Amino acid sequence: MAVKTYNAGVKDYRNTYWEPDYSVKDTDILAVFKITPQAGVDREEAPAAVAAESSTGTWTTVWTDLLTDLDYYKGRAYRIEDVPGDDTCFYAFIAYPIDLFEEGSVVNVFTSLVGNVFGFKAVRALRLEDVRFPIAYVKTCGGPPHGIQVERDIMNKYGRPLLGCTIKPKLGLSAKNYGRACYEGLRGGLDFTKDDENVNSQPFMRWRQRFDFVMEAIQKAEAETGERKGHYLNVTAPTPEEMYKRAEYAKEIGAPIIMHDYITGGFCANTGLANWCRDNGMLLHIHRAMHRVLDRNPHHGIHFRVLTKILRLSGGDHLHSGTVVGKLEGDREATLGWIDIMRDRFIKEDRSRGIFFDQDWGSMPGVMPVASGGIHVWHMPALVTIFGDDSVLQFGGGTLGHPWGNAKGAAANRVALEACVEARNRGVAIEKEGKAVLTEAAKHSPELKIAMETWKEIKSEFDTVDKLDVAHK
């Protein structure tokens, strides 16, 4: 048996963590980082340093390396690629053995992959672009509490996108007036109304009163329309204990769905809440507040496609996904990529949409993408084309800003939605022919006609900051 020797001192990371000949294993967790190295840092040294700091390494050789099988547990930088059109940075591909991570813990995964390594002096900027989770790891995670098909069965709604509305103004309404706004929207044709991300339990509207008035609105709207209705009751709270208290009360009063801010609320809390929803028959809507702090800078942070994968593992039945056409930025091809990541069982590598790895979700349910942010009836043809049926199209100002009130705004959106779905089903290219489709529908809907006149000049044409690096195929 060979005797292990220990040589103290500082070594180049590439001597241990750069392995260009490594054969990736099916069980490895794979990550691709965009690295902007400091001046003078070698092209192979920088990714090796990232692999070391995000797995087993430290700044110097330590004698306790001899007490474990370092070669088994270490992360390995195995490939480098140029970033098209940007010679200041490059892509580095790193493989991590699955045993580095606690089963079913996205918290532990992120602690390694986006932990201390992001403050590493060897790199000037670092961005996690994509992660491949092996099926062996996927199966240790609970995932969405119910998924798309179960939600459709619970709500008894099929064959079209679901229609929602975020109540505005997002802050300042009393609980009674808030409930009235929900009722008007639901009776007008919405499937869901929604708390905004920062509606928790403030002095102007405590959570219990809001829950009570909203549930009264749901029940009244259901009785009038004969349709199942819901409202995303935000249970995000200062502590997990308070969060579960609010969730339990929502269940007690008969609410079908609750809501959580998964980034500001925390991944640990989110996974626990998803497990609770699965056990208690509650749907879980997820808001992504704070995501742009992490994902907007094209050189530093975490790409949103990674945040979607983490959410699918942690658990949520809905996730805000951008709109492409509204007030919030989002590249079309990239958005289509992460919509597939949220919904599909298997997603192939597709650099034209920013997808670096095949991703197999096995039997894990999908997440319903939610389009929300500055959208109105004129956007409906594009939204139905981009998102398809398994989505929620959520109009806040585009409902509540209707000149005739909330119910009429909801009716306008419902007519526009059903007209677009019907035209699409007849084979009409609705994104191209959308104006004609809406104009024809408006002949029989004064609510839609007024909505079209109100928002015909409203556009959001600012360029996207975070663009795809690769040329479209």
Curated annotation (Swiss-Prot):
Residues reported to bind substrate: 116, 166, 170, 288, 320, 372
Coiled coil (residue ranges): none
Catalytic residues, chain numbering: 168 (proton acceptor), 287 (proton acceptor)
Cofactor field: Mg(2+)
EC number: 4.1.1.39
Catalysed reaction, written as an equation: 2 (2R)-3-phosphoglycerate + 2 H(+) = D-ribulose 1,5-bisphosphate + CO2 + H2O; D-ribulose 1,5-bisphosphate + O2 = 2-phosphoglycolate + (2R)-3-phosphoglycerate + 2 H(+)
Regions that span the bilayer: none
Top EC class, one word: lyase
Miscellaneous remark of the record: The basic functional RuBisCO is composed of a large chain homodimer in a 'head-to-tail' conformation. In form I RuBisCO this homodimer is arranged in a barrel-like tetramer with the small subunits forming a tetrameric 'cap' on each end of the 'barrel'.
Function: RuBisCO catalyzes two reactions: the carboxylation of D-ribulose 1,5-bisphosphate, the primary event in carbon dioxide fixation, as well as the oxidative fragmentation of the pentose substrate. Both reactions occur simultaneously and in competition at the same active site.
Subunit structure: Heterohexadecamer of 8 large chains and 8 small chains.
Protein name, entry field: Ribulose bisphosphate carboxylase large chain 2
Organism: Acidithiobacillus ferrooxidans
Organismal lineage: Bacteria, Pseudomonadati, Pseudomonadota, Acidithiobacillia, Acidithiobacillales
